[in-house]
A protein has these predicted regions:
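Soluble catalytic domains of membrane acyltransferases
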Residues: 25-159
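Extreme N-terminal tail/first-helix region
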Residues: 1-30
Length: 159
């Protein structure tokens, strides 16, 4: 996988401190932690309903010392923000055509040297859906990694 803000040592340390401060100042709490025996996993974060999900996920990721990668629609990776989005752990997804994303994700997780948590919104969109897409399941199955469930409760300020 590509180098990210989570794998940049000094920046990671500074942003962890900043994230913990932001959580405290805004009244948010991060509950739970990653299971200790899963350095690699697929994290499904639901429901994905707000543009604030990404910054809040990054903050929670720093607080939990995660090495996050996340999937986002291709349009947010366009210039001038594309390089920044990739450095934040983003992986562009073209939702308009089939691109073997599951197979590529499986290969990337298997090839990763260290810890890696791939965040996938199971709905595939911020809009209302009646059911989840299944890509996250097949990524985890193919990579032989666990699925970890996560959430953002904006009303109670819990993550």
């Amino acid at each position: 996988m590509h180098r990210t803000i989570f794998t940049t040592p000094v920046v990671n340390t500074l942003l962890r401190g900043l994230s913990l401060t932001i959580l405290k100042l805004t009244g948010w709490r991060v509950e739970g932690s990653l299971p200790p025996d899963c350095p690699k996993c697929v994290v499904i974060a639901a429901p994905h309903t707000s543009n604030w999900d990404l910054p809040n996920t990054l903050i929670a990721g720093f607080a939990l010392r995660m090495n996050l990668y996340w999937m986002g629609k291709r349009s947010i990776f366009a210039p001038p923000f594309g390089a920044l989005m990739r450095w934040l752990g983003g992986i562009a997804v073209n939702r308009e055509k089939s691109t073997n994303l599951v197979a590529a994700s499986v290969d990337a997780i298997r090839a990763a040297d260290g810890p890696l948590q791939l965040v996938v919104p199971p709905e595939g969109t911020r809009g209302a859906t009646r059911h989840w897409k299944t890509g996250f399941y097949y990524i985890a199955l193919g990579a032989k990694v666990p699925i970890v469930m996560a959430y953002m409760d904006y009303q109670r300020k819990l993550s």
